[in-house]
């Protein structure tokens, strides 16, 4: 099982991980089936040759080296220690009694006693030449994940694993996390859309933290997202577009067609929604002309206007502003008109009469991307569409 907490830093992801760990410890305070890799692992500490639970690498290696013979020997050794303690209690108590009697004091407890929390220290040494000199932090993380895979740990908590991994190795880290989640309960906190796009996503286990006031995490309600006005007739849509209005197939479409862009959008404060490549090129030019290209936003391509509505519903559930750009298209098609009206319920939008190319008076072929880019370079009426960037209620 893979549970995922996503959101910016400082919005409660790490707190949620720690709370989950505390819940598990309430079930058994001495449990040893939990392991956490924090966002700030100091890999130099992992090279030390003293056994300490904070040194994850050595702790895992020691656990993997254990077998029945070693455990039997440990148990016999601990029993022998307990026996020796019991046999020598009286001697230590007598010494304490003698010293206390000088001041007319009395001993309240045994001086020594057996303990159930025995520790075995300095059992192994990790030769750190390769770990220190040859491996980067991403490789060291992957080494730890492989050790965890072979260990008896059941609950794995990973706090921002992307912090340790170079982008070129992120797919390897993601693959190891996916493999871990087959037989173990893995909980990961991340603010990386790139990592999310590489993970096996179960939307039922996806929690979105985007409330700066530490509100409860949000979950996407896909049944609500695919619910639209009954006046829109799905039978009039093509077969692929119909799949965007069923919760299961909508999730499948996100994973297969929109995964990386979808998670980038979830991390955004504003999403510009578009249909195709010409919309994308126009929007990028419009952003640059209005000096908006450095603001926090994402561009989400839906591959068809009928697909807008469920995505608008998802993003608005999460408190993300949606600004759709769309063609008016056929005004005699009642279904198309109704879809347009639903899209226009967004606070800001751009609608093109009857399509973007006609609106801009572009006379070339819609499919000639190079010609369209050249046309945009010489287009001089971007100001007409700048209202989507201001605070007014005006739309174009």
State the predicted function of each range:
Residues 54-155:
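Extended helical coiled-coil dimerization/tether regions that scaffold
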Residues 1-5, 10-12, 17-23, 123-256, ...:
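Switch/communication elements of ASCE P-loop NTPase nucleotide-binding domains
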Residues 22-25, 42, 61-66, 182, ...:
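Non-catalytic alpha-helical coupling and interface elements of nucleotide-dependent molecular machines
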Residues 2-7, 11, 18-28, 33-37, ...:
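Acidic, Mg2+-coordinating catalytic modules of nucleic-acid enzymes
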Residues 63-86, 220-223, 231-234, 345, ...:
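Charged, low-complexity surface segments at secondary-structure and domain boundaries
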Residues 29, 116-118, 159, 178, ...:
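A generic structural signal for short, solvent-exposed coil/turn residues
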Residues 22, 94-102, 179, 289:
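A generic structural signal for well-ordered alpha-helical segments enriched in polar/charged residues
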Residues 47-60, 216-220, 365-370:
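Short, polar loop/linker segments at the starts of domains and inter-domain junctions
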């Amino acid at each position: 099982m893979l549970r995922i907490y996503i959101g910016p830093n400082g919005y409660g992801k790490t707190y949620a991980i720690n709370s989950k760990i505390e819940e598990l410890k309430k079930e058994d305070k001495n449990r040893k089936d939990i392991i956490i890799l924090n966002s700030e692992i100091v890999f130099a500490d992992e090279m030390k040759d003293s056994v300490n639970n904070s040194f994850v690498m050595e702790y895992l290696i020691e656990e993997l080296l254990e077998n029945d013979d070693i455990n039997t020997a440990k148990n016999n050794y601990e029993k022998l220690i307990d026996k020796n303690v019991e046999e020598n209690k009286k001697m230590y108590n007598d010494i304490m009694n003698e010293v206390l009697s000088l001041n007319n004091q009395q001993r309240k407890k045994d001086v020594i006693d057996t303990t159930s929390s025995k520790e075995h220290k300095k059992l192994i040494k990790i030769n750190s030449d390769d770990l220190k000199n040859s491996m980067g932090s991403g490789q060291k993380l992957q080494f730890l994940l492989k050790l965890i895979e072979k260990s008896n740990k059941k609950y794995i908590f990973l706090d921002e694993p992307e912090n340790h991994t170079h982008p070129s190795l992120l797919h390897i880290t993601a693959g190891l996390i996916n493999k871990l989640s087959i037989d173990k309960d893995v909980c990961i906190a991340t603010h990386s859309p790139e990592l999310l796009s590489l993970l096996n996503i179960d939307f039922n286990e996806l929690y979105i933290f985007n409330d700066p006031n530490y509100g409860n995490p949000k979950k996407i309600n896909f049944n609500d997202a695919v619910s639209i006005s009954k006046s829109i007739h799905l039978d009039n849509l093509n077969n692929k577009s119909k799949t965007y209005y069923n919760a299961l197939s909508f999730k499948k479409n996100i994973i297969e067609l929109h995964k990386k862009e979808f998670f980038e959008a979830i991390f955004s404060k504003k999403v510009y929604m578009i249909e195709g490549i010409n919309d994308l090129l126009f929007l990028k030019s419009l952003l640059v002309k209005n000096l908006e290209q450095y603001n926090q936003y994402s561009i989400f391509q839906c591959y068809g206007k009928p697909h807008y509505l469920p995505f608008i519903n998802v993003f608005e559930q999460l408190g993300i502003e949606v600004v759709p750009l769309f063609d008016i298209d056929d005004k005699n098609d009642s279904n198309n008109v109704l879809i347009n009206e639903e899209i226009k319920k967004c606070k800001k939008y751009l609608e093109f009469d009857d399509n973007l190319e006609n609106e801009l008076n572009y006379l070339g072929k819609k499919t000639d991307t190079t010609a369209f880019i050249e046309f945009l370079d010489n287009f001089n009426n971007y100001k007409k569409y700048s209202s989507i960037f201001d605070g007014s209620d005006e739309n174009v």
